[in-house]
Amino acid sequence: MNIREEMEKMEKEILSPFACCSVDSLGRDLPEEEDDIRTIFQRDRDRILHSKAFRRLKHKTQVFIQPEGDHYRTRLTHTLEVSQIARSIAKALRLNEDLTEAIALGHDLGHTPFGHAGERALNKLCSGGFSHVDQSIRIVEILEKNGRGLNLSKEVRDGIQNHRSSGKPKTLEGQAVRFADKIAYLNHDVDDGIRAGLFREEELPAEYRKVLGFTARERLNTLIRSVIFTSRGKDKLSMEPIMEENMQGLRKWMFQNVYTSSKAKEEEWKVDGMLKLLFSFYQEHPLEMAEEYRFLLKKGEEEGTEDPKLLLDRIVADYISGMTDEYCSHKFMEYFVPKAWEKD
């Protein structure tokens, strides 16, 4: 019995009957020889962690576009916070932590530069629309590894595909990530809003503070414990109704006071204009895209299974959505801002 088999045996003995054990995985689309040390979900986690898309998250906006300060969240720090919360829930409920971590690390790979402002811009520009959730799946199935994808397990892909609020993950591990995502972004966005001077802690609605907690630490602890103690011994994860109601109420307050107003919105019109110009430029000059995207475009044209315009739009969206905030700004400056010149 090798190390992987020992771990798989241990999972069967220790994990909850509602957990997804590694040995019970539905596998990958392309079968692979099993590793003698790592389980299937550990390998998935490692593939995501070492992917280029994951590394780019460190320079992608969470809420505030180009904030001045080192302590505002980025898409990467959000992802790590989701992973920590989801693993805490999984450990307490005796779920598969490796599967949970893999889903958490991969759930936001498809996010655009400049956060949801970039996503909204691409959704308007791209034929067929654009969603960061669908793009996350496209990254792991196609775009990574020069068009080969990461060949992740069906369980990890299901968790990534269904992490949005309306999603219904088939595994409890996927459900843990879905709750962790909501808990993480609400709490750290409140924290970043206070740091940005948009409001003070004391200005948060009293009714939500009374139920959820008077500090970021209290709110985080309250919501995580609610998921854990409401879900123990059950085949579906949930939260106490009063906690769910107050979390949604605070989220609505954040939309009214942060997400759709103030500093979080001031620069969005620039993002919209920037991406519109870049999208049109790459439609007209596809050879200016990076080599891997030119390869995918050529491959699609040779296969001839997709409408040429839809294909071009999709590859351009792939390229732009993969950019970091800084790289996107750099490309805009390169193509649309006159350069200084020196006299010979």
Can you describe what each PLM-predicted range is?
Residues M1-T79, S83-I89, N96-E97, F130-D344:
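Histidine-centered, transition-metal-coordinating active-site segments
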Residues L99, I103-N146:
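A generic, well-ordered mixed alpha/beta core segment in the N-terminal half of proteins
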